Amino acid sequence: NLDWFKEVMEYPSYEEMFNNSFEVTTSKLLYLPYLKGERSPFIDPLARGALIGIDTQTDKKQIGRTVLEGVCMAFKHCLVALCEDMPKQLILTGGTSRSRSFCQLFADVLQVEIVLLNEQQNIGLLGVLTSCGIEKKKTTNHENKENFIPNKNLKNYYAKKYTTFQHAYPTL
């Protein structure tokens, strides 16, 4: 989704794409990020993406913000299907973790603390060990680089938007 958006909007870098998209603080739009079908939490290889709520006042920045929100909501959709209870913390790695704004958006949409680690080497192993119930303290000496606390003022906003997100796919 992010590669597609960067290419279509002709951003020269991800940094510029993120910076532009976060100039807007909220968006009335909704984005379903099913550009190549969907495999989780539902299986539908024919599912397609959608940008809902667009009008003549919609600009590139609003669309960017909405695409990023849609990516976060799709992750939340998977997490809700997978977990009985939402976790209190998630470790974020990869390219999007380089954007502080995206990390904060992720925390706000999920209403979960997002943790970045100083050392990301062997992070996949950490995930496997954690999912097996082996305590992080016993296996690694990773330290937190930064924590992103969810903005409680956005809790209701994103809860309503997520409910709309959940209902949007089946109605298309």
Language model: regions and residue ranges:
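Active-site core segments that coordinate phosphate-bearing ligands/cofactors
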Residues: 1-93, 98-172
